[in-house]
Amino acid sequence: MGYQGDKDRIPNIDILLKDGEIWKEENFESKIIYVPGHTLGHICFYFFKDKAVFTGDTLFSLGCGRLFEGTYAQMFMSLNKIKELPLDTKIFCGHEYTLSNSKFCAAHDKNNQNLKKKILEIKKKLNNNLPTIPTTIKEELECNIFLKANNLETFSKLRDLKDKF
């Protein structure tokens, strides 16, 4: 299974998925969201019934994925697609980088009271061996500096800074 654009790049893809397609399997139904940036064939699965999105390496709690194959513009547009999901959508990402991402956000968004509160919650969860995932679209819009970037230039600068952080 994979994005239709990867059919010639990845051998043996048996199910080709398209942006906006509704994919059904057993009792699950999800919308495919094409989100190039981290890779050229990256997709997210948005599960309507559960109000949950699996973002892989596109969006993390308080961060976003590195650009391995895609461009800044592609990642910026992909994040904007995810931002359009309902505010109470739960986000399940591909890696647990929340604490390190929180340090970067705090260094570049020093007056964000929502972020300060979230960092305390993150530390409390981790101290109690609890996961910091899922987060929600609402929380990420309030605290994730990459989602708060309102233009491509700002986003690109932040992504470069994070790569060196």
Spans of model-derived segments:
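Divalent metal-coordination and catalytic microenvironments
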Residues: L17, V35-H38, D57, M75, ...
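Active-site-adjacent loop/tail segments of enzyme domains
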Residues: G63-T89
